[in-house]
Amino acid sequence: MTRTDLEVASDFVHGWVASPKQRRARLGRTLPVAAVQVAALSHPDLAIRRSCLFLLDHYASDASSDIFRRALRDPVASVRESALHGLVCERCRHEDICVTEVVTDVIEILAFDPNPEVRHKAVAALARLIGRDGRAGEAIARAAHHDSDAAIRLTAQIVADSGQPHVRSRKAALRDVRRAARSRSS
């Protein structure tokens, strides 16, 4: 009986999660990449999709850029966050990312993703790419004026004003917006 890619990937994810941390790196080298790529896009369990994206980011990120890009359209926000991270993270890659393609994708996420958490992470990703593609700064400046979420507007404005690649957490941005609203009403 032949096992499907979804079964192979699911079994691998469960085995990886159950393994001691010191064994995971060795297990990661045996990653069934094709099966995990299929599962990252089509497994019915969102936890498996997220885990597959995590594994691809850490063990096969260079070969999985298209998978990350396609997973940006997942209906679940936390899966899109994982896909966004996999697309922009350079730490686990051996090859350089294609900045032009990545910035194009992240600008689209910032402009159109319905989830403010995902858009906040898009601001953070673009902030790290400002010096490598001018469109990143332009998109952040647009978000500072036009995003529907006040915390994203504030975060984007801070990045646009400072040019710093570091973005505070969404929780901190929400706190700053509430604090500013209280001080205006006082």
Question: Where do the PLM segments sit?
Answer:
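N-terminal "cap/leader" segments of large eukaryotic alpha-helical scaffolds
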Residues: M1-R24
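Amphipathic alpha-helical scaffolding segments comprising HEAT/armadillo-like alpha-solenoid repeats
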Residues: R3-S10, G28-S42, S61-R73, R93-L110, ...
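Alpha-solenoid HEAT/ARM repeat scaffold
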Residues: L6, S10, R50-S51, E81-H85, ...
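Alpha-helix N-cap/helix-start positions at coil->helix boundaries
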Residues: L6, V17, L46-A47, A77-S78, ...
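Alpha-helical solenoid scaffolds in large eukaryotic transport, assembly, and signaling factors
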Residues: R23-G28, L55
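Eukaryotic acidic, Ser/Thr-rich intrinsically disordered low-complexity regions
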Residues: H145-S186
